[in-house]
Swiss-Prot record:
The active site is at H327 (proton donor). It comes from Mycobacteroides abscessus (strain ATCC 19977 / DSM 44196 / CCUG 20993 / CIP 104536 / JCM 13569 / NCTC 13031 / TMC 1543 / L948). It catalyses: urea + 2 H2O + H(+) = hydrogencarbonate + 2 NH4(+). It comes from the Bacteria. This is Urease subunit alpha. The lineage of its organism: Bacteria, Bacillati, Actinomycetota, Actinomycetes, Mycobacteriales.
Length: 577
Protein backbone atom coordinates (compact mmCIF):
# COMPACT_ATOMS: atom_id res chain seq x y z
CA UNK A 1 0.00 0.00 0.00
CA UNK A 2 1.29 3.45 -0.92
CA UNK A 3 1.75 5.73 2.07
CA UNK A 4 2.16 9.49 2.17
CA UNK A 5 4.42 11.27 4.61
CA UNK A 6 2.73 13.95 6.70
CA UNK A 7 4.68 16.59 4.82
CA UNK A 8 3.56 15.27 1.44
CA UNK A 9 -0.05 14.90 2.62
CA UNK A 10 -0.09 18.49 3.90
CA UNK A 11 1.16 19.79 0.55
CA UNK A 12 -1.62 17.94 -1.27
CA UNK A 13 -4.57 18.38 1.08
CA UNK A 14 -3.48 20.64 3.91
CA UNK A 15 -2.47 19.66 7.44
CA UNK A 16 -4.42 16.99 9.30
CA UNK A 17 -4.95 15.63 12.81
CA UNK A 18 -1.84 16.11 14.94
CA UNK A 19 -0.23 18.64 12.63
CA UNK A 20 0.74 22.01 14.10
CA UNK A 21 0.59 25.46 12.51
CA UNK A 22 2.18 28.74 13.55
CA UNK A 23 -0.13 31.77 13.46
CA UNK A 24 1.52 34.55 11.44
CA UNK A 25 4.91 35.40 12.98
CA UNK A 26 3.73 34.96 16.57
CA UNK A 27 4.82 32.29 19.03
CA UNK A 28 1.27 30.88 18.99
CA UNK A 29 1.00 27.31 17.72
CA UNK A 30 -2.26 25.48 17.03
CA UNK A 31 -2.70 21.74 16.63
CA UNK A 32 -5.53 20.16 14.65
CA UNK A 33 -7.41 17.83 16.98
CA UNK A 34 -9.80 16.28 14.45
CA UNK A 35 -10.02 15.93 10.66
CA UNK A 36 -13.58 15.38 9.46
CA UNK A 37 -12.78 15.51 5.75
CA UNK A 38 -9.62 13.39 5.37
CA UNK A 39 -6.48 12.40 7.20
CA UNK A 40 -6.16 9.24 9.30
CA UNK A 41 -9.03 6.88 8.48
CA UNK A 42 -10.38 9.01 5.63
CA UNK A 43 -7.30 9.49 3.45
CA UNK A 44 -8.11 9.10 -0.22
CA UNK A 45 -11.65 10.46 0.18
CA UNK A 46 -10.77 14.19 0.26
CA UNK A 47 -12.91 16.60 -1.75
CA UNK A 48 -10.48 18.69 -3.80
CA UNK A 49 -11.25 20.94 -6.76
CA UNK A 50 -9.10 21.43 -9.86
CA UNK A 51 -7.90 19.92 -13.10
CA UNK A 52 -7.52 16.16 -12.74
CA UNK A 53 -8.85 16.29 -9.21
CA UNK A 54 -11.84 14.96 -7.28
CA UNK A 55 -14.78 17.35 -7.61
CA UNK A 56 -15.75 16.48 -11.17
CA UNK A 57 -18.98 15.10 -12.64
CA UNK A 58 -19.69 11.49 -11.62
CA UNK A 59 -16.67 11.60 -9.32
CA UNK A 60 -16.71 13.91 -6.29
CA UNK A 61 -19.58 15.89 -7.82
CA UNK A 62 -22.93 14.13 -7.63
CA UNK A 63 -26.07 14.66 -9.71
CA UNK A 64 -27.95 16.26 -6.80
CA UNK A 65 -29.80 19.44 -7.73
CA UNK A 66 -30.10 22.53 -5.60
CA UNK A 67 -33.80 21.78 -5.26
CA UNK A 68 -32.76 18.39 -3.94
CA UNK A 69 -30.65 19.98 -1.21
CA UNK A 70 -27.17 20.57 -2.64
CA UNK A 71 -25.28 23.42 -0.94
CA UNK A 72 -24.60 26.65 -2.77
CA UNK A 73 -20.95 26.70 -1.69
CA UNK A 74 -18.50 24.31 -0.08
CA UNK A 75 -15.24 25.43 1.51
CA UNK A 76 -12.95 22.41 1.27
CA UNK A 77 -10.44 21.26 3.86
CA UNK A 78 -10.51 24.34 6.08
CA UNK A 79 -8.75 24.58 9.43
CA UNK A 80 -11.48 25.94 11.72
CA UNK A 81 -10.46 27.98 14.76
CA UNK A 82 -13.40 28.70 17.05
CA UNK A 83 -14.16 28.84 20.75
CA UNK A 84 -15.41 25.25 20.64
CA UNK A 85 -12.32 23.72 19.07
CA UNK A 86 -9.65 23.58 16.38
CA UNK A 87 -10.47 21.06 13.67
CA UNK A 88 -10.29 20.51 9.93
CA UNK A 89 -13.49 20.12 7.92
CA UNK A 90 -15.39 20.95 4.77
CA UNK A 91 -17.96 23.70 5.35
CA UNK A 92 -21.25 23.85 3.46
CA UNK A 93 -23.21 27.06 2.86
CA UNK A 94 -26.77 27.33 1.59
CA UNK A 95 -29.07 30.37 1.52
CA UNK A 96 -26.38 32.34 3.32
CA UNK A 97 -26.15 29.99 6.30
CA UNK A 98 -23.80 27.25 7.40
CA UNK A 99 -25.51 23.91 6.73
CA UNK A 100 -22.74 21.43 7.38
CA UNK A 101 -19.31 21.02 8.96
CA UNK A 102 -17.89 17.66 8.03
CA UNK A 103 -17.07 15.81 4.84
CA UNK A 104 -18.21 16.95 1.39
CA UNK A 105 -18.40 14.99 -1.83
CA UNK A 106 -20.51 12.40 -3.64
CA UNK A 107 -22.00 9.67 -1.43
CA UNK A 108 -22.53 7.46 -4.49
CA UNK A 109 -18.80 6.76 -4.60
CA UNK A 110 -17.37 8.25 -1.38
CA UNK A 111 -17.71 7.12 2.23
CA UNK A 112 -18.71 9.34 5.13
CA UNK A 113 -20.21 12.24 3.17
CA UNK A 114 -22.39 14.52 5.29
CA UNK A 115 -25.93 14.63 3.77
CA UNK A 116 -25.79 18.44 3.96
CA UNK A 117 -22.50 18.53 2.05
CA UNK A 118 -23.35 16.60 -1.11
CA UNK A 119 -21.68 18.51 -3.93
CA UNK A 120 -23.88 19.01 -6.98
CA UNK A 121 -23.82 20.92 -10.27
CA UNK A 122 -25.10 24.04 -8.49
CA UNK A 123 -22.31 24.02 -5.89
CA UNK A 124 -19.44 26.52 -5.96
CA UNK A 125 -16.10 25.57 -4.37
CA UNK A 126 -13.78 27.71 -2.28
CA UNK A 127 -10.46 26.01 -1.54
CA UNK A 128 -9.87 26.16 2.19
CA UNK A 129 -7.00 23.68 2.06
CA UNK A 130 -3.97 25.04 3.92
CA UNK A 131 -6.12 27.97 5.06
CA UNK A 132 -7.68 28.92 8.38
CA UNK A 133 -11.36 29.81 8.82
CA UNK A 134 -12.70 31.85 11.71
CA UNK A 135 -16.11 33.36 12.37
CA UNK A 136 -16.52 36.91 11.13
CA UNK A 137 -15.26 39.34 13.72
CA UNK A 138 -17.61 41.42 15.88
CA UNK A 139 -16.40 44.88 16.84
CA UNK A 140 -18.37 45.65 19.98
CA UNK A 141 -17.23 49.28 20.34
CA UNK A 142 -17.66 51.32 17.15
CA UNK A 143 -17.95 55.09 16.78
CA UNK A 144 -19.74 55.68 13.47
CA UNK A 145 -17.79 58.83 12.64
CA UNK A 146 -17.25 58.31 8.91
CA UNK A 147 -18.38 55.71 6.36
CA UNK A 148 -14.78 54.93 5.46
CA UNK A 149 -14.54 52.77 8.58
CA UNK A 150 -16.60 50.06 6.86
CA UNK A 151 -14.05 49.01 4.23
CA UNK A 152 -11.30 49.28 6.83
CA UNK A 153 -13.23 46.95 9.13
CA UNK A 154 -13.94 44.42 6.37
CA UNK A 155 -10.25 44.48 5.44
CA UNK A 156 -9.47 43.47 9.02
CA UNK A 157 -11.94 40.58 9.17
CA UNK A 158 -14.86 42.36 10.88
CA UNK A 159 -18.38 41.51 9.67
CA UNK A 160 -20.49 42.98 12.51
CA UNK A 161 -20.35 46.43 14.10
CA UNK A 162 -21.91 47.33 17.44
CA UNK A 163 -21.93 50.99 18.48
CA UNK A 164 -23.35 54.35 17.57
CA UNK A 165 -22.84 57.68 15.94
CA UNK A 166 -24.18 59.99 13.26
CA UNK A 167 -20.96 61.10 11.56
CA UNK A 168 -18.28 63.62 12.58
CA UNK A 169 -20.41 65.33 15.23
CA UNK A 170 -18.81 65.95 18.61
CA UNK A 171 -21.26 63.62 20.35
CA UNK A 172 -20.42 60.78 17.98
CA UNK A 173 -16.68 61.36 18.17
CA UNK A 174 -16.85 60.86 21.92
CA UNK A 175 -19.72 58.60 22.87
CA UNK A 176 -20.77 55.69 20.57
CA UNK A 177 -24.35 56.92 20.63
CA UNK A 178 -26.93 57.38 17.88
CA UNK A 179 -29.41 59.63 19.72
CA UNK A 180 -33.07 59.63 18.81
CA UNK A 181 -35.28 57.99 16.23
CA UNK A 182 -34.49 60.47 13.45
CA UNK A 183 -30.74 59.85 13.59
CA UNK A 184 -31.25 56.11 14.02
CA UNK A 185 -33.40 56.00 10.91
CA UNK A 186 -30.86 57.90 8.83
CA UNK A 187 -28.01 55.65 9.95
CA UNK A 188 -29.92 52.42 9.30
CA UNK A 189 -30.81 53.68 5.83
CA UNK A 190 -27.24 54.78 5.14
CA UNK A 191 -25.83 51.39 6.13
CA UNK A 192 -28.55 49.33 4.46
CA UNK A 193 -26.46 48.50 1.39
CA UNK A 194 -23.20 47.59 3.11
CA UNK A 195 -22.11 43.96 3.63
CA UNK A 196 -21.86 44.48 7.38
CA UNK A 197 -24.21 43.50 10.20
CA UNK A 198 -25.14 46.55 12.28
CA UNK A 199 -26.34 46.95 15.87
CA UNK A 200 -26.99 50.54 16.89
CA UNK A 201 -26.90 51.85 20.45
CA UNK A 202 -29.22 54.68 21.43
CA UNK A 203 -28.62 57.25 24.14
CA UNK A 204 -29.44 55.86 27.56
CA UNK A 205 -28.43 58.96 29.50
CA UNK A 206 -31.89 60.04 30.64
CA UNK A 207 -34.27 59.30 33.47
CA UNK A 208 -37.22 59.58 31.09
CA UNK A 209 -38.24 56.08 29.94
CA UNK A 210 -40.31 57.48 27.06
CA UNK A 211 -37.14 58.92 25.52
CA UNK A 212 -35.60 55.45 25.55
CA UNK A 213 -38.65 53.60 24.24
CA UNK A 214 -38.91 55.91 21.23
CA UNK A 215 -35.31 55.05 20.39
CA UNK A 216 -36.04 51.34 20.63
CA UNK A 217 -38.95 51.77 18.23
CA UNK A 218 -36.61 53.77 16.00
CA UNK A 219 -34.02 51.02 15.62
CA UNK A 220 -31.77 51.02 18.68
CA UNK A 221 -30.90 47.50 19.81
CA UNK A 222 -29.48 48.65 23.11
CA UNK A 223 -28.26 51.72 24.94
CA UNK A 224 -24.97 53.42 25.65
CA UNK A 225 -24.39 55.19 28.95
CA UNK A 226 -21.47 57.61 28.60
CA UNK A 227 -20.00 59.95 31.16
CA UNK A 228 -19.86 62.78 28.61
CA UNK A 229 -23.68 62.74 28.67
CA UNK A 230 -23.84 62.27 32.45
CA UNK A 231 -23.78 58.71 33.80
CA UNK A 232 -25.31 59.19 37.23
CA UNK A 233 -26.66 56.40 39.45
CA UNK A 234 -30.21 57.52 38.67
CA UNK A 235 -29.53 57.33 34.93
CA UNK A 236 -27.96 53.87 35.24
CA UNK A 237 -30.97 52.55 37.13
CA UNK A 238 -33.51 54.12 34.76
CA UNK A 239 -31.76 52.78 31.67
CA UNK A 240 -31.45 49.26 33.05
CA UNK A 241 -35.15 49.26 33.95
CA UNK A 242 -36.06 49.90 30.32
CA UNK A 243 -33.43 47.42 29.10
CA UNK A 244 -34.84 44.70 31.34
CA UNK A 245 -38.32 45.26 29.95
CA UNK A 246 -37.19 45.51 26.32
CA UNK A 247 -34.60 42.68 26.48
CA UNK A 248 -31.67 44.72 25.18
CA UNK A 249 -28.13 45.36 26.43
CA UNK A 250 -26.65 48.46 28.04
CA UNK A 251 -23.03 49.45 27.39
CA UNK A 252 -21.51 51.45 30.22
CA UNK A 253 -18.79 54.11 30.16
CA UNK A 254 -18.78 55.28 33.76
CA UNK A 255 -17.77 58.44 35.59
CA UNK A 256 -13.98 59.01 35.37
CA UNK A 257 -14.13 62.06 37.64
CA UNK A 258 -16.15 60.25 40.33
CA UNK A 259 -18.44 63.30 40.43
CA UNK A 260 -21.63 61.42 41.25
CA UNK A 261 -20.07 58.52 43.12
CA UNK A 262 -17.37 55.91 42.98
CA UNK A 263 -17.21 52.48 41.40
CA UNK A 264 -19.04 51.02 44.40
CA UNK A 265 -21.93 53.42 43.81
CA UNK A 266 -22.13 52.48 40.15
CA UNK A 267 -22.21 48.79 41.03
CA UNK A 268 -24.95 49.50 43.56
CA UNK A 269 -26.97 51.34 40.90
CA UNK A 270 -26.52 48.42 38.52
CA UNK A 271 -27.90 46.21 41.26
CA UNK A 272 -26.74 42.87 39.91
CA UNK A 273 -28.36 43.39 36.50
CA UNK A 274 -26.59 42.38 33.29
CA UNK A 275 -24.41 45.09 31.76
CA UNK A 276 -21.61 45.40 29.21
CA UNK A 277 -18.76 47.39 30.79
CA UNK A 278 -16.79 49.32 28.18
CA UNK A 279 -13.19 50.38 28.88
CA UNK A 280 -12.80 48.03 31.80
CA UNK A 281 -9.10 48.88 32.00
CA UNK A 282 -9.91 52.57 32.51
CA UNK A 283 -7.59 54.15 29.93
CA UNK A 284 -10.58 54.95 27.77
CA UNK A 285 -12.65 56.16 30.70
CA UNK A 286 -14.54 55.04 33.76
CA UNK A 287 -14.06 55.48 37.49
CA UNK A 288 -10.44 56.39 38.22
CA UNK A 289 -8.45 54.49 39.27
CA UNK A 290 -10.40 51.31 39.99
CA UNK A 291 -13.02 50.73 37.28
CA UNK A 292 -11.01 47.60 36.44
CA UNK A 293 -12.45 45.93 39.54
CA UNK A 294 -15.82 45.48 37.81
CA UNK A 295 -14.27 42.47 36.03
CA UNK A 296 -14.74 40.58 39.31
CA UNK A 297 -18.54 40.65 39.18
CA UNK A 298 -20.80 37.94 37.71
CA UNK A 299 -23.33 40.32 36.11
CA UNK A 300 -20.70 42.49 34.39
CA UNK A 301 -19.55 41.45 30.92
CA UNK A 302 -16.32 43.41 30.51
CA UNK A 303 -14.51 44.57 27.39
CA UNK A 304 -11.54 46.75 26.60
CA UNK A 305 -10.37 48.36 23.38
CA UNK A 306 -7.44 47.92 21.06
CA UNK A 307 -5.37 51.12 21.64
CA UNK A 308 -4.05 49.60 24.88
CA UNK A 309 -3.61 46.14 23.36
CA UNK A 310 -1.04 45.00 24.25
CA UNK A 311 0.86 47.20 26.71
CA UNK A 312 3.97 48.45 24.90
CA UNK A 313 6.70 51.03 25.41
CA UNK A 314 4.72 53.43 23.18
CA UNK A 315 1.26 53.04 24.71
CA UNK A 316 1.37 55.84 27.28
CA UNK A 317 2.92 58.48 25.03
CA UNK A 318 0.29 57.88 22.38
CA UNK A 319 -2.73 58.06 24.63
CA UNK A 320 -2.71 61.53 26.14
CA UNK A 321 -3.03 63.44 22.87
CA UNK A 322 -5.59 60.95 21.57
CA UNK A 323 -7.75 61.42 24.63
CA UNK A 324 -7.66 65.22 24.44
CA UNK A 325 -8.98 65.11 20.87
CA UNK A 326 -11.58 62.39 21.39
CA UNK A 327 -13.30 64.01 24.35
CA UNK A 328 -13.21 67.61 23.15
CA UNK A 329 -10.80 68.68 25.89
CA UNK A 330 -8.72 71.86 26.01
CA UNK A 331 -5.04 71.52 26.92
CA UNK A 332 -5.10 75.14 28.14
CA UNK A 333 -7.57 74.22 30.87
CA UNK A 334 -5.75 72.57 33.82
CA UNK A 335 -8.83 70.61 34.83
CA UNK A 336 -9.16 69.14 31.32
CA UNK A 337 -5.52 68.08 31.37
CA UNK A 338 -5.90 66.51 34.81
CA UNK A 339 -8.99 64.67 33.59
CA UNK A 340 -6.98 63.17 30.73
CA UNK A 341 -3.97 62.28 32.85
CA UNK A 342 -6.15 60.53 35.44
CA UNK A 343 -7.06 57.88 32.87
CA UNK A 344 -3.62 56.97 31.57
CA UNK A 345 -2.32 54.65 34.28
CA UNK A 346 0.42 52.19 33.27
CA UNK A 347 -0.40 49.82 36.13
CA UNK A 348 -4.00 49.24 35.07
CA UNK A 349 -3.07 49.02 31.37
CA UNK A 350 -0.49 46.38 32.28
CA UNK A 351 -3.05 44.50 34.37
CA UNK A 352 -5.38 44.51 31.37
CA UNK A 353 -2.91 42.17 29.63
CA UNK A 354 -3.14 39.59 32.40
CA UNK A 355 -6.90 39.90 32.83
CA UNK A 356 -7.38 39.12 29.15
CA UNK A 357 -5.06 36.14 29.38
CA UNK A 358 -6.88 34.55 32.30
CA UNK A 359 -10.29 35.26 30.74
CA UNK A 360 -11.36 37.95 33.20
CA UNK A 361 -11.78 40.69 30.58
CA UNK A 362 -13.95 38.95 28.04
CA UNK A 363 -14.07 41.08 24.88
CA UNK A 364 -11.95 43.37 22.70
CA UNK A 365 -13.37 46.15 20.51
CA UNK A 366 -11.83 48.98 18.55
CA UNK A 367 -13.15 52.31 19.88
CA UNK A 368 -12.81 53.36 16.25
CA UNK A 369 -11.42 56.86 15.64
CA UNK A 370 -12.05 57.62 19.31
CA UNK A 371 -8.67 56.31 20.49
CA UNK A 372 -8.81 52.96 18.68
CA UNK A 373 -8.27 51.61 15.18
CA UNK A 374 -11.09 49.70 13.53
CA UNK A 375 -8.87 47.66 11.24
CA UNK A 376 -6.76 46.31 14.11
CA UNK A 377 -9.21 44.51 16.40
CA UNK A 378 -8.15 41.05 15.27
CA UNK A 379 -4.46 41.84 14.96
CA UNK A 380 -4.10 43.40 18.40
CA UNK A 381 -6.00 40.55 19.99
CA UNK A 382 -3.38 38.10 18.72
CA UNK A 383 -0.50 40.42 19.58
CA UNK A 384 -1.79 40.37 23.16
CA UNK A 385 -1.96 36.57 23.14
CA UNK A 386 1.61 36.40 21.87
CA UNK A 387 2.93 38.81 24.50
CA UNK A 388 1.21 36.87 27.26
CA UNK A 389 2.63 33.56 26.06
CA UNK A 390 6.11 35.08 26.03
CA UNK A 391 5.66 36.33 29.58
CA UNK A 392 3.54 33.64 31.23
CA UNK A 393 4.21 30.51 29.20
CA UNK A 394 1.57 27.92 28.37
CA UNK A 395 -1.93 28.22 29.79
CA UNK A 396 -3.26 25.40 31.99
CA UNK A 397 -4.27 22.56 29.70
CA UNK A 398 -1.92 23.58 26.89
CA UNK A 399 1.08 21.23 26.56
CA UNK A 400 4.40 23.08 26.72
CA UNK A 401 7.74 22.18 25.20
CA UNK A 402 8.85 21.72 21.58
CA UNK A 403 5.80 19.62 20.70
CA UNK A 404 3.28 21.71 22.61
CA UNK A 405 0.40 23.83 21.36
CA UNK A 406 -1.60 26.87 22.40
CA UNK A 407 -5.07 25.61 21.54
CA UNK A 408 -6.69 26.72 24.80
CA UNK A 409 -5.18 30.19 24.61
CA UNK A 410 -6.12 30.55 20.94
CA UNK A 411 -9.70 29.45 21.60
CA UNK A 412 -9.95 31.95 24.47
CA UNK A 413 -8.70 34.85 22.40
CA UNK A 414 -10.76 34.16 19.28
CA UNK A 415 -13.86 34.16 21.50
CA UNK A 416 -13.12 37.74 22.57
CA UNK A 417 -14.14 39.14 19.18
CA UNK A 418 -16.64 36.49 18.08
CA UNK A 419 -18.92 34.56 20.42
CA UNK A 420 -18.51 36.66 23.59
CA UNK A 421 -19.83 39.94 22.13
CA UNK A 422 -22.53 37.99 20.30
CA UNK A 423 -23.78 36.49 23.57
CA UNK A 424 -23.45 39.78 25.43
CA UNK A 425 -25.71 41.58 22.95
CA UNK A 426 -28.19 38.76 22.34
CA UNK A 427 -27.25 38.03 18.73
CA UNK A 428 -25.49 34.67 19.15
CA UNK A 429 -28.47 32.88 17.60
CA UNK A 430 -27.37 34.41 14.27
CA UNK A 431 -23.61 35.02 14.43
CA UNK A 432 -20.48 34.67 16.54
CA UNK A 433 -19.24 31.17 15.73
CA UNK A 434 -18.68 28.62 12.99
CA UNK A 435 -21.74 26.49 13.69
CA UNK A 436 -24.50 24.92 11.65
CA UNK A 437 -27.54 27.18 11.36
CA UNK A 438 -25.73 30.46 11.78
CA UNK A 439 -25.09 33.08 9.12
CA UNK A 440 -22.12 32.18 6.94
CA UNK A 441 -20.04 35.12 8.13
CA UNK A 442 -16.58 33.64 7.74
CA UNK A 443 -13.01 34.83 7.28
CA UNK A 444 -10.35 32.84 5.42
CA UNK A 445 -6.71 33.42 6.35
CA UNK A 446 -3.41 32.22 4.96
CA UNK A 447 -1.57 30.99 8.11
CA UNK A 448 1.37 33.31 7.43
CA UNK A 449 -1.02 36.28 7.34
CA UNK A 450 -3.39 35.13 10.09
CA UNK A 451 -4.82 38.10 11.96
CA UNK A 452 -3.05 40.52 9.64
CA UNK A 453 -4.76 40.41 6.24
CA UNK A 454 -7.67 38.11 5.35
CA UNK A 455 -7.46 36.02 2.22
CA UNK A 456 -11.23 36.42 1.80
CA UNK A 457 -14.19 37.67 3.82
CA UNK A 458 -17.49 35.84 3.35
CA UNK A 459 -20.65 37.64 4.43
CA UNK A 460 -23.93 35.75 4.41
CA UNK A 461 -22.44 33.20 2.04
CA UNK A 462 -21.03 35.68 -0.51
CA UNK A 463 -17.39 36.71 -0.91
CA UNK A 464 -17.55 40.43 -0.17
CA UNK A 465 -13.89 41.30 0.33
CA UNK A 466 -10.72 39.53 -0.77
CA UNK A 467 -7.01 39.92 -1.38
CA UNK A 468 -6.94 40.55 -5.11
CA UNK A 469 -4.20 41.41 -7.56
CA UNK A 470 -4.13 43.63 -10.63
CA UNK A 471 -7.52 43.44 -12.37
CA UNK A 472 -5.82 43.89 -15.77
CA UNK A 473 -3.47 40.97 -15.19
CA UNK A 474 -3.77 37.59 -16.86
CA UNK A 475 -4.34 35.80 -13.53
CA UNK A 476 -5.73 37.01 -10.15
CA UNK A 477 -2.44 37.06 -8.22
CA UNK A 478 -0.01 39.63 -9.76
CA UNK A 479 1.02 42.53 -7.54
CA UNK A 480 -0.13 44.83 -6.21
CA UNK A 481 -2.40 42.61 -4.11
CA UNK A 482 -4.84 44.67 -2.06
CA UNK A 483 -7.96 43.95 -0.01
CA UNK A 484 -10.68 44.85 -2.51
CA UNK A 485 -14.49 44.76 -2.65
CA UNK A 486 -15.96 41.83 -4.57
CA UNK A 487 -19.27 41.33 -6.39
CA UNK A 488 -21.19 40.42 -3.24
CA UNK A 489 -20.20 43.78 -1.75
CA UNK A 490 -22.21 45.62 -4.38
CA UNK A 491 -25.05 47.41 -2.62
CA UNK A 492 -28.02 45.63 -4.20
CA UNK A 493 -26.56 42.26 -3.22
CA UNK A 494 -25.04 43.25 0.10
CA UNK A 495 -28.40 44.29 1.54
CA UNK A 496 -29.54 40.69 1.25
CA UNK A 497 -26.42 39.27 2.91
CA UNK A 498 -26.34 41.41 6.05
CA UNK A 499 -28.80 42.19 8.84
CA UNK A 500 -29.71 45.06 11.13
CA UNK A 501 -30.02 43.89 14.72
CA UNK A 502 -32.82 45.79 16.45
CA UNK A 503 -34.98 45.48 19.54
CA UNK A 504 -38.07 43.25 19.56
CA UNK A 505 -40.02 46.50 19.98
CA UNK A 506 -38.83 47.75 16.57
CA UNK A 507 -40.02 44.56 14.89
CA UNK A 508 -43.44 44.92 16.49
CA UNK A 509 -43.56 48.55 15.33
CA UNK A 510 -42.84 47.55 11.69
CA UNK A 511 -39.62 49.55 11.46
CA UNK A 512 -38.50 47.94 8.19
CA UNK A 513 -41.58 49.19 6.34
CA UNK A 514 -41.43 52.63 7.93
CA UNK A 515 -37.82 53.13 6.79
CA UNK A 516 -38.14 51.18 3.51
CA UNK A 517 -35.14 49.04 4.45
CA UNK A 518 -34.05 46.27 2.11
CA UNK A 519 -32.14 44.12 4.54
CA UNK A 520 -33.59 41.76 7.12
CA UNK A 521 -34.20 43.07 10.64
CA UNK A 522 -33.37 40.62 13.42
CA UNK A 523 -34.43 41.15 17.05
CA UNK A 524 -32.04 40.68 19.93
CA UNK A 525 -32.85 37.66 22.03
CA UNK A 526 -32.30 36.37 25.56
CA UNK A 527 -30.15 39.31 26.65
CA UNK A 528 -31.12 40.15 30.19
CA UNK A 529 -30.64 36.74 31.77
CA UNK A 530 -27.04 36.45 30.56
CA UNK A 531 -23.99 36.97 32.72
CA UNK A 532 -20.27 36.49 32.70
CA UNK A 533 -20.59 32.76 33.28
CA UNK A 534 -22.16 32.51 29.81
CA UNK A 535 -19.05 33.83 28.03
CA UNK A 536 -17.04 30.82 26.78
CA UNK A 537 -13.48 30.62 28.13
CA UNK A 538 -13.75 34.23 29.34
CA UNK A 539 -15.70 33.86 32.55
CA UNK A 540 -12.99 34.29 35.20
CA UNK A 541 -13.83 36.48 38.20
CA UNK A 542 -10.61 37.01 40.17
CA UNK A 543 -10.32 39.32 43.16
CA UNK A 544 -9.03 42.65 41.78
CA UNK A 545 -7.84 45.49 44.00
CA UNK A 546 -6.30 48.85 43.06
CA UNK A 547 -4.31 50.96 45.53
CA UNK A 548 -5.90 54.44 45.39
CA UNK A 549 -2.57 56.21 45.93
CA UNK A 550 -0.03 54.18 43.93
CA UNK A 551 -2.49 52.59 41.46
CA UNK A 552 -0.80 49.23 42.09
CA UNK A 553 -3.06 46.40 40.90
CA UNK A 554 -3.36 43.14 42.82
CA UNK A 555 -5.05 40.19 41.14
CA UNK A 556 -5.94 37.41 43.56
CA UNK A 557 -3.48 39.00 45.97
CA UNK A 558 -0.53 39.12 43.56
CA UNK A 559 0.95 42.36 42.24
CA UNK A 560 1.14 42.38 38.45
CA UNK A 561 4.34 44.19 37.49
CA UNK A 562 4.60 46.44 34.45
CA UNK A 563 6.75 45.01 31.65
CA UNK A 564 5.70 46.82 28.47
CA UNK A 565 6.60 45.00 25.28
CA UNK A 566 9.36 46.54 23.16
CA UNK A 567 8.75 44.40 20.08
CA UNK A 568 5.62 42.84 18.61
CA UNK A 569 4.79 40.33 15.90
CA UNK A 570 2.31 41.13 13.11
CA UNK A 571 3.96 44.53 12.72
CA UNK A 572 6.88 45.71 10.58
CA UNK A 573 7.28 42.38 8.82
CA UNK A 574 3.88 43.04 7.26
CA UNK A 575 3.44 46.81 7.06
CA UNK A 576 5.41 49.70 5.60
CA UNK A 577 3.89 52.17 8.05
Amino acid sequence: MTRLTREHYAKLYGPTTGDRIRLADTDLIIEITEDRCGGPGLAGEEAVFGGGKVLRESMGQSRLTRAGGAPDTVITGAIIIDHWGIIKADIGIRDGRIVGIGKAGNPDIMDGVDPALIVGPSTEIIAGNNRIVTAGGIDCHVHFICPQILPEALSGGITTMIGGGTGPAEGSKATTVTPGAWHLGRMLQALDGWPMNILMLGKGNTVNPDAMWEQLRGGAAGFKLHEDWGTTPAVIDACLRVADEADVQVALHSDTLNETGFVEGTLAAIGGRAIHAYHTEGAGGGHAPDIITVASHPNVMPSSTNPTRPHTVNTLDEHLDMLMVCHHLNAAVPEDLAFAESRIRPSTIAAEDLLHDIGAISMIGSDSQAMGRIGEVVMRTWQTAHVMKKRRGALPGDPSGPNGNDNNRVRRYVAKYTICPAITHGIDHEIGSVEVGKLADLVLWEPAFFGVRPHAVIKGGGIVWAAMGDANASIPTPQPVFPRPMFSAMHAVAAGLAVHFVSPTAIEDDLAARLALRRRLVPTRDVRNRGKADLPLNDAMPDIRVDPDTFTVRIDGEVWEEHPAAELPMAQRYFLF
